[in-house]
Amino acid sequence: TTPSVVQITKDEVKIGNAAKRAMVTNPKNTISFVKRLMGADFNDENVKKMQKLATYDIVNKSGKPYVKIDDKEYSPEQISSMIVGKMKKVAEDYVGEEIKDAVITVPAWFGDTARTATKTAGELAGLNVLRVINEPTSAALAANLMEDKKDKTVVVVDSGTGTVDVSVLELSDGMAEVLASNGDVYLGGKDYDDAIVKWVVDEFKKSDDVDLTKDNMAYARVVESAEKAKIELSSSSQTEINLPYISMKDGALLNLAMTLSRAKFESLVKNLNDRTVEKAKVAVEKAGKKYDDIDCILLVGGTTRIPSLQEALKKEFNKPLNQSVNPDEAVALGAAKQADILAGNSTGDLLLLDVTPLSLGI
């Protein structure tokens, strides 16, 4: 997958993994989580929170949040269009022809202004946006949950790098209605990484009396190793974190070598799992549904690979977890299926009606 990260310097623009790798050495020029600014007003509470957390400057331009890099100001749509443009090129390189049309997905809680801003980003990237659809609906389409046209109630838990979105869908005869949506734009895979980072930093401080947060390059290596450790612990009972020559003390080079067990990791992230489950519980309540009404829980986003999160969801809802589609690809695959239908290429007769009721409060 390609991280939604952009780094802008006077010499070049880096997008995706290249920007993510360069983030620690030049955080001021590196933009991430711009999705949180889409369609927002500068005085929104969410923007105020982003100003405190972002490594880059967010400024007021005509009542809207803009990203300021050096002496230039960029709208969220412009930054987002750079990411969309990169993906357009990746797709064109793969299929060997120009791509003009696209279906773009958004979180179910996105309001009209955020949806319009997303469509604008696609257009700035040179695309004709055929439709903007809800991410949980797209995931349900990818998982073939709508093909039999039977009535179903599905809870979609989408946990990505920086956000958790839980939606309750009612599927009926090719129609998908979002009954309720609930989430946290400040909870996701990065928080699981951060839990490991904190543990590593604390343990090293105890053993070697060196604070790795004071050294940007050392800290960047810890952050990178934490993400790898998290991924490995989804399939292994323990993992090794080895960072040779991580620091220096009294003229001697120091090595970092630690073993992190899955059990220890689970204890570090229990509160994150609990918060995600709570978001799902509230979504079901808002939808006016009982647990017995739920047919399955569809897992979307890389963070849902974490075994302890899966167990927490199973324990709470006692419902089957649908993992039939790669969680990193589910939303994109559903969008591709919808695009195929709209282009008239699909042999199926599914016409997706994606409904977001006003009762969602967006």
Residue ranges and their predicted role:
Residues T1-G63, K68-M82, K89-I362:
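Oxyanion-binding/catalytic loops of NTP- or PPi-dependent enzymes
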